[in-house]
């Protein structure tokens, strides 16, 4: 004899214990108690009585201005700020706009010893290059920091730090 599987759906004729059976379609498709089933009044018939909301008068008058007083507006000083989008200062000269002399220039480079040069010197000294070889990083421009200057007024436009 085959046993019914526990995951099979229940049979149609069974009812749950303690629960009444659901209503039939005829019972629920009857008249809705919240809406009247009678005919609606004609649309051209006007409702009698007050409007549903109190009306409020709207006055578009502006407050009176004092005569004889001139209208003054504050003076605003405008300063133009030139932003150079995507300008990256590297180890080669770039075309930039100098905010001091207001010229479009190609930058002048100046190299200075930064942290990478000193760390390279210390690293070479640790490995035994004490007799002058540890000073080689001070001669290599690719290890130094780069400062970009304006060739006209010598103002600093940007700095490229190696480390």
Swiss-Prot record:
Residues covered by region (Membrane-binding amphipathic helix): 116-136
UniProt domain LITAF: residue ranges: 78-162
Spans annotated as Disordered: 1-23
Membrane topology: Peripheral membrane protein
Coiled coil: none
Domain of life assignment: Eukaryota
Subcellular location: Cytoplasm; Nucleus; Lysosome membrane; Early endosome membrane
Molecular function per GO: DNA binding; zinc ion binding
Protein name as annotated: Lipopolysaccharide-induced tumor necrosis factor-alpha factor homolog
InterPro entries: LITAF, LITAF_fam
PANTHER family xrefs: LIPOPOLYSACCHARIDE-INDUCED TUMOR NECROSIS FACTOR-ALPHA FACTOR (PTHR23292), LIPOPOLYSACCHARIDE-INDUCED TUMOR NECROSIS FACTOR-ALPHA FACTOR HOMOLOG (PTHR23292:SF45)
Cellular component, GO annotation: cytoplasmic side of early endosome membrane; cytoplasmic side of late endosome membrane; cytoplasmic side of lysosomal membrane; cytoplasmic side of plasma membrane; Golgi membrane; nucleus
Keyword Cytoplasm in annotation: yes
Entry similarity comment: Belongs to the CDIP1/LITAF family.
UniProt keyword annotation of Transcription present: yes
Domain comment quoted from the record: The LITAF domain is stabilized by a bound zinc ion. The LITAF domain contains an amphipathic helix that mediates interaction with lipid membranes.
Keywords of the record: Cell membrane, Cytoplasm, DNA-binding, Endosome, Golgi apparatus, Lysosome, Membrane, Metal-binding, Nucleus, Transcription, Transcription regulation, Zinc
UniProt short sequence motif PPxY motif, positions renumbered to this chain: 22-25
Lineage: Eukaryota, Metazoa, Chordata, Craniata, Vertebrata
Functional note: Plays a role in endosomal protein trafficking and in targeting proteins for lysosomal degradation. May also contribute to the regulation of gene expression in the nucleus. Binds DNA (in vitro) and may play a synergistic role in the nucleus in regulating the expression of numerous cytokines.
């Amino acid at each position: 004899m085959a046993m019914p599987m526990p995951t099979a759906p229940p049979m149609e004729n069974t009812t749950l214990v303690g629960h009444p059976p659901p209503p039939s379609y005829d019972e629920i498709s009857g008249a809705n108690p919240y809406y009247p089933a009678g005919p609606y009044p004609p649309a051209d018939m006007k409702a009698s009585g007050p409007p549903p909301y109190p009306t409020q008068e709207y006055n578009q008058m502006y407050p009176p201005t004092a005569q004889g007083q001139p209208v003054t507006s504050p003076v605003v000083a405008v300063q133009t700020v030139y932003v150079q989008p995507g300008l990256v200062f590297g180890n080669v000269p770039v075309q930039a706009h100098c905010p001091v002399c207001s010229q479009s220039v190609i930058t002048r480079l100046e190299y200075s010893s930064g942290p990478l040069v000193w760390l390279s010197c210390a690293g070479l000294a640790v490995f035994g290059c004490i007799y002058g070889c540890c000073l080689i990083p001070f001669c290599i421009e690719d290890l130094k920091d780069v400062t970009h200057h304006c060739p006209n007024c010598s103002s600093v436009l940007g700095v490229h730090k190696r480390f």
